[in-house]
């Protein structure tokens, strides 16, 4: 009944947030290279009259890139978004959005001054009604068109440098599938030539911040289309799972009774159509995915290549990964050793942190294990398990941030693969976000994880941790000081005892006010560090 009721909202609710703003997907905006739409609240570009923001030229990072992409001027995603726009809204204070009409993550209220912290929960801890509501929200997103965003169906060159716009409407769920595809697609070099060693969302430092921003935008989109401001994406804790416990009709869809590669007809996910899964066809045609339906979701969990991924990740592998102190290292790609990012992403062995691209660990392991739509990078977001999986991966990233408390400078400023330097703007988001802006605690972005919350002691422990670390560093000195203090105390005690023995024969006028036994019974002692 709840699912039916949600279906009725399809003709009522409208979404927002994604890739190309509809109001900027026209010849005039493309030729002017400007995307500074008016805010509805006052009718001025970027809400300038209300002091929300101004239309400004985009300042691009000039930091050098790594050697992985040896071309320049051949891909629309280079120096994002300058091929399409060189002027966008720069929002002030806590305002955000392509027209500064929204609040930054973690803020709410008319003037975006109210802090708000939401909690992402384990999907198996949701009540039946909460779980059904989540599934209904996903189905709603799959069936309602985006009001504010469209997708590009051609390159800038194919658009004749903006004079012939090529954009298309898309539903809210598939908008995010397309964005994931667009960020990870190959570079089209002309003819039948492509460059595959490029990815703006994977295999480099931006993997974790990019997906963090991606989920936050997806989460906010669902909040908007449902009117449920408290909605958060649940996570699936897959550590030590023996099989795909989430793959049931009660949750994300069971297995088809006669075709193990399909979903059970009892799950409405079985009727979903996938997009952006035929990368070789796009490459041969030198075309972009245009969001045409390409068939049902494929999933055959556990029937993958066991030599590459023998099982789902374990708790011990996650714990080892969290001990790694370097966020990034070496070449800062899938060949990086002792890199927390590369180990969590799954290109390095989860027991040694040495790169091994013949195996798939941690994050990658789950994608391979699903053995279907989720196992191909560009189209993996078609399977709704993607959301649950990446929410848990993000929670591991959050654990590492809280444990090691890195400075922003730990995130590489230069020489990372294209699009992954700290100040690079993330492809393909408009409004613009830099990689470094999401290399911070989730609490600063307005959300937490149920299993990471520390109810009473959290804030106090956060306050103490830096001082405890300093104490740990000077511990040898503290021990030495304690030993010396003990010696001095012993010497002084001996001298005092000797003096007291001498005083036993003194006159009453100079006797102590308390006897030794009274001293012992009535004086309280405190120890100090």
UniProtKB/Swiss-Prot annotation:
Task: Indicate yes or no for the key word Magnesium.
Answer: no
UniProt keywords (A-Z) are:
Copper, Glycoprotein, Melanin biosynthesis, Membrane, Metal-binding, Monooxygenase, Oxidoreductase, Signal, Transmembrane, Transmembrane helix
Substrates-to-products reaction catalysed = 2 L-dopa + O2 = 2 L-dopaquinone + 2 H2O; L-tyrosine + O2 = L-dopaquinone + H2O
Transmembrane portions of the chain: 477-497
Signal peptide extent = 1-18
UniProt EC number: 1.14.18.1
Q: What's one GO BP annotation on this UniProt entry?
A: response to blue light
Lumenal, melanosome face: residue ranges? Answer: 19-476
Q: Which cofactor does it need?
A: Cu(2+)
Give me the residues that bind Cu cation A, please. Answer: 180, 202, 211
GO terms, molecular function: metal ion binding; tyrosinase activity
- Membrane topology label: Single-pass type I membrane protein
Residues given in the record as Cu cation B binding sites: 363, 367, 390
Q: What is its main location?
A: membrane
Topological domains annotated Cytoplasmic: 498-529
For this chain's record, the cofactor binding note is: Binds 2 copper ions per subunit.
Q: Residues annotated as region Disordered? A: 293-313
Cell compartment(s), UniProt: Melanosome membrane; Melanosome
The protein's job, in short, is: This is a copper-containing oxidase that functions in the formation of pigments such as melanins and other polyphenolic compounds. Catalyzes the initial and rate limiting step in the cascade of reactions leading to melanin production from tyrosine. In addition to hydroxylating tyrosine to DOPA (3,4-dihydroxyphenylalanine), also catalyzes the oxidation of DOPA to DOPA-quinone, and possibly the oxidation of DHI (5,6-dihydroxyindole) to indole-5,6 quinone.
Q: Which family does it belong to?
A: Belongs to the tyrosinase family.
In its UniProt entry, what is this protein called?
A: Tyrosinase
- The species this protein was found in: Gallus gallus (Chicken)
Q: Which gene encodes it?
A: TYR
